[in-house]
């Protein structure tokens, strides 16, 4: 009839974005620079905001990115015993317009979610995985806020 397995058997399954812990640690190192670049970009975007309400939203996102940077640095140090060298002092690329900046920020947040999901699958169970889950939900919240700002500004 049907091929069946005892209730305790589970066929092996690996998500396509699963990576090793070593790969996750390398991506954490990259994430530090990514969060720093986002922070610099958002500083430029804040200056272009048409009003203080929108500037405050972006400032809140920027401040979250600073916190993410610190958490990623701590995770990297905890896993490797080494500190990540200071992020480069490069300047943020110029923002051509407020709307284009919002679009770029929105896409950047979505890309971060994809990268961080891979890191999440490479981390062991526990506080680091839980912390990264918080960062992922922050990035989703940021994407939602940028989407809201885009809709608001494009409908005017």
Region locations from a protein language model:
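Non-heme di-metal
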Residues: 1-156
């Amino acid at each position: 009839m049907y091929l069946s397995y005892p209730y305790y058997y589970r066929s092996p399954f690996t998500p396509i974005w699963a990576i090793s812990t070593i790969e996750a640690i390398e991506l954490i190192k990259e994430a530090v620079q990514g969060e720093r670049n986002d922070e610099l970009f958002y500083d430029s975007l804040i200056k272009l905001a048409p009003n203080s309400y929108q500037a405050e939203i972006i400032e809140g996102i920027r401040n979250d990115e600073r916190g993410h940077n610190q958490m990623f640095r701590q995770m990297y140090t905890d896993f490797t015993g080494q500190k990540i060298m200071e992020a480069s002092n490069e300047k943020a690329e110029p923002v051509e317009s407020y709307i284009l900046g919002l679009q770029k920020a929105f896409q950047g947040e979505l890309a971060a979610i994809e990268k961080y999901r891979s890191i999440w699958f490479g981390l062991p169970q526990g506080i680091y995985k839980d912390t990264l889950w918080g960062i992922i939900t922050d990035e989703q919240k940021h994407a939602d806020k940028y989407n809201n700002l885009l809709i608001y500004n494009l409908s005017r």
